[in-house]
Amino acid sequence: MSMAQGESCGADTVVADTTVVKKKTWIDKFLDYFNDANKNKKHKKFDFSIIGGPHYNSDIKFGLGLVAAGLYRTCPTDTLLPPSNVSLFSDVSTVGFYLLGIRGTNIFPQDKSRLKYTIYFFSFPSGFWGIGYDSCDNDDNGSEMKRWQARIKASYAVRLSKNLYLGPIVAYDYIHSSRVTRPELLNGQDASIWNLGLGVQLMYDSRDVLTNPHRGYYLNVEQSFRPKFLGNKYTFATTEIETSVYARPWRGAVLAYDFRTMLNFGNPSWAMMALFGSSNSMRGYYEGRYRDKHKFETQLELRQHVWKRNGVVVWGGFGTVFSKFEQLQFRRLLPNWGFGYRWEFKKNVNVRLDYGFGKPGQRGFIFNINEAF
């Protein structure tokens, strides 16, 4: 028995002596982090990851962005419930721009209601060309201002029937501008303003995935009011409509179409005008170079999966700004096109790198998370 014990100990000793646990380097841990980021983690209550990268565009020049994405289910046992999402985003650039914000959609159990929210603030030495297509299209009107802006917007929509939702919205905006080089372009309006708005939202949403749709239809109509009794100096009403449709023409491809419009009725301030260009629509334009009471934008995008977690996109579109509907003319249409790269950061959450082009001199590189629409 003692020999058996001795042999057992000897065997154990040999195993212990020959087993070497290789310690992972920080590079191994870094690669493992991104290799595992897009795996479906239904066992985790909250799946959260962070990534950063450089970018360049015509308004904030060279910058470094940091984004984080989180996925979760309000009812973990309901696998048919679409995951809720939250994104944190921050940015700094060489011209003194900085941004910090959070946005997301919380889908309540059984998808009976949805809470959508956006909170951000930024500081930016921005350009300003005035109000209206003709003024904004004139390069000689280029001026500068130091702008600090904050926004809080939230909507709570209750499901009325399959894919149909209705509910209230609230929005607060504060804009402080200083060092305005050409104040006459403000048309006598205050350089710093705030607005509080209340309204209602009607939404139809049959998209299969909110962050990276492959098929389905989306229609969102928002009607908001900023009356005087809420303390607003500039009183107006805003109608916003966005509609998108998604189809799969062949394997690995998604064809996505988007149309959106913003119509302001009343007396909106220069800071609350409809702005042309953003990271989601008319990509590549200096955001706010063109501004007026109304705008419309439309775009068609082809998204193609290439290999593993990699994909590419191309898009084209056009739009314009206007103060009266009779100003809608072909010569005032602003073209837009571009291409981009996609990397699946998390399951159905893409990091997107886009390079967009507009009129001559209007172009930009965008680093962001989730699809543009």
Where are these regions (language model features)?
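Sec-dependent signal peptide cleavage junction
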Residues: S2-K41
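Outer membrane beta-barrel transmembrane domains
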Residues: F265-R352
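Membrane-embedded beta-strand positions of outer-membrane beta-barrel proteins
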Residues: I50-G52, A68, V86-S90, L115-I119, ...
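Short loop/turn motifs that connect adjacent beta-strands in outer-membrane beta-barrel proteins
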Residues: A37-F46, T74-P83, P109-R114, R159-N163, ...
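Membrane-spanning beta-strands of outer-membrane beta-barrel proteins
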Residues: K61, F97, R147-Q149, N195, ...
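C-terminal outer-membrane beta-barrel translocator/porin domains of Gram-negative envelope proteins
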Residues: L198-M203, R207-H305
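Outer-membrane beta-barrel "beta-signal"
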Residues: G199-V200, F339-F345, Q362-F373
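Gram-negative/organellar outer-membrane beta-barrel architecture
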Residues: N40-I50, H55-D190, W194, N350-V351, ...
